[in-house]
């Protein structure tokens, strides 16, 4: 001990494990190198991983209310708009209503700066159902990287022919790109 400090010789320990900028040393039954994660990932504890931690994305979502909860839905463009506060990687998209349509499906298209971000009809909520998660046709995202400051708008392209549906919400799921 020298001046209140404990000196420990660790020469050759961590440097033999780490090979790349950003590497960390972790432990399972021995010291192991955990390679640096990808951009936008962060380190989390995970008891199912051999060394107890892994890199993952911090998932977040935007929920866009496209109507009130009690009025019938109506076909039209720009039913709701938001401006993204940061660059966003879209990994999933879904929609739900609190009152199901009858007679026809609900079809919804989402746009980034007036350009569709999904192929085909976009999101479908099947007639008599309240969620797109159970739809026979799931949406295919064609533009997953959404720019900071872009305007996200929702178009309602088809509604039920009996009950039109009520209380439409869109869920944009993904992570912030840093």
What are these regions (language model features)?
Residues 1-178:
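Extracellular repetitive beta-rich solenoid segments
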């Amino acid at each position: 001990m020298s001046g209140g400090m404990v000196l420990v010789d660790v020469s050759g320990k961590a440097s033999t494990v780490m090979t790349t900028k950003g590497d960390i040393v972790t432990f399972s039954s021995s010291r192991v190198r955990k390679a640096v994660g990808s951009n936008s990932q962060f380190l989390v504890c995970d008891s199912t991983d051999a060394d107890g931690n892994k890199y993952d994305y911090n998932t977040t979502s935007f929920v866009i209310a496209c109507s009130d909860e009690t009025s019938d839905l109506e076909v039209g463009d720009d039913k709701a708009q938001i401006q993204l506060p940061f660059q966003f990687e879209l990994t999933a998209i879904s929609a739900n209503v609190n009152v199901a349509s009858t007679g026809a499906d609900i079809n919804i298209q989402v746009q980034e700066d007036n350009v569709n971000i999904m192929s085909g009809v976009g999101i479908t909520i099947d007639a008599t159902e309240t969620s797109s998660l159970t739809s026979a046709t799931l949406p295919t995202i064609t533009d997953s990287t959404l720019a900071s400051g872009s305007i996200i708008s929702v178009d309602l392209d088809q509604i039920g022919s009996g009950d039109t549906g009520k209380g439409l919400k869109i869920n944009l799921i993904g992570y912030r790109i840093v």
